[in-house]
């Protein structure tokens, strides 16, 4: 072990989705870990609390020439580099020297092939992915659909993709106390939380609420967030006569959003395929909610085992979503069962501590096996991870989920 003494993570900016994972890297490696932030955060993300509490291990290249020079040197000298959304120049010399590199990527084709045929982007994709297919670079997949997307791109990263994601802080709970807290309303409580954008499809849960009310179910739906669809949703609620069932709340900071999740029994995630990952699924599972998630979100196939720790519905299908919610409303014991199993999934495997250790274990296994990207595709057997972060990523099609099976 301990093949990895230095790890440098390059990305455009540092945010709360990355902090917990990076904190774990720092606990293990100390000053051997650095996060390189290559650009200032956009105003709207900063206003959402993304840029708060920046740790000492973060180095901002845009603040000084000295910082930029350090980042350039670390790109070559580090035992392991993780490339997020950052200039490709950082890994080019490194790959020429055959040094191990992990690319941290959501699915590249979530909008289809259209961008691949824009000349500027075609050139970029060839440089980043196709030219490097046989170099010492592997993919940490921040979507269950990433591996197949890269395969479609002229078989980039052949058999070199591993499950990963984004890892917000894992919160520890006393499950008995948490379950009691969720039952205080006296009826089943459902939460939808996020930016109210078209790609998030919040209208689906409002339509499902109408179906549930018409079927005589007792429940409350709380919707948290702001965005272009907020007025549309408020109008839907009035038009459908749901004012007694549906309430709204404005945007919450990340910490307050997590607290709100802990108060609700069911969490619904409705986004379409433009949702690269969907960290709210992670957060809902951690909060011991019975999560009902769209099948096409990047996190869903990795985190949710249908009818074990949550439920999956067919993306965009109100009937499918309604039926899954009815399953839970018909059986409150099922809500608690899925909630407890959800927490255990996150507590045992899908958490920042395990993810950081798994990255280092995978990297050490590849180095031990003499990986050069061309001749070696698998880590040594003792380093292989069977399930969870850094286990092998399979190929998953958009239409993988068959409702009712």
Sequence positions of predicted segments:
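Conserved donor-binding/catalytic core segment of Leloir-type glycosyltransferases
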Residues: 181-200, 206-209, 222
């Amino acid at each position: 072990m301990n093949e990895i003494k230095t790890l440098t993570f390059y990305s455009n900016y540092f945010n709360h989705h990355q902090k917990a994972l990076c904190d774990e890297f720092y606990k293990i490696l100390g000053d051997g870990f650095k996060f390189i932030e290559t650009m200032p955060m956009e105003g709207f993300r900063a206003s959402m609390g993304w840029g708060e509490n920046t740790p000492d291990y973060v180095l901002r290249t845009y603040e000084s020439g000295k910082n930029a020079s350090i980042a350039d040197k670390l790109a070559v000298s580090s035992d392991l580099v993780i490339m997020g959304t950052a200039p490709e120049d950082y890994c080019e010399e490194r790959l020429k020297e055959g040094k191990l590199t992990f690319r941290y990527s959501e699915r590249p084709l979530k909008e289809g092939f259209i961008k691949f045929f824009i000349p500027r982007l075609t050139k970029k994709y060839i440089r980043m992915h196709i030219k490097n297919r046989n170099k010492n670079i592997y993919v940490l997949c921040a979507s269950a659909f990433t591996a197949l997307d890269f395969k479609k791109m002229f078989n980039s990263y052949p058999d070199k993709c591993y499950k990963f994601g984004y890892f917000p802080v894992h919160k520890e709970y006393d499950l008995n106390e948490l379950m009691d807290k969720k039952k205080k309303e006296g009826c089943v409580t459902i939460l939808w939380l996020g930016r109210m954008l078209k790609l998030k499809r919040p209208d689906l849960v409002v339509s499902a609420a109408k179906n549930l009310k018409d079927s005589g179910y007792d429940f409350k739906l709380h919707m948290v967030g702001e965005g272009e669809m907020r007025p549309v949703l408020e109008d839907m609620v009035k038009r459908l006569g749901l004012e007694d069932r549906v309430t709204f709340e404005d945007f919450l900071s990340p910490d307050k959003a997590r607290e709100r999740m802990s108060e609700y029994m069911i969490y619904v995630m409705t986004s379409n395929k433009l949702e690269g990952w969907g960290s709210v699924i992670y957060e809902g599972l951690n909060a011991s909610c019975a999560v009902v998630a769209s099948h096409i979100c990047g996190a869903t196939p990795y985190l949710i085992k249908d009818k074990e720790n949550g439920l999956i519905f067919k993306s965009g299908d109100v009937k499918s979503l309604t039926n899954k919610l009815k399953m839970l409303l018909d059986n409150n014991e099922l809500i608690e069962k899925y909630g407890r199993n959800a927490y255990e999934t996150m507590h045992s495997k899908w958490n920042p501590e395990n993810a950081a250790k798994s990255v280092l274990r995978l990297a050490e296994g590849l180095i031990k096996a003499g990986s050069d990207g061309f001749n070696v595709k698998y880590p040594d057997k003792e380093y292989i991870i069977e399930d969870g972060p850094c286990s092998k990523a399979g190929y998953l099609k958009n239409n993988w989920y068959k409702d009712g099976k």
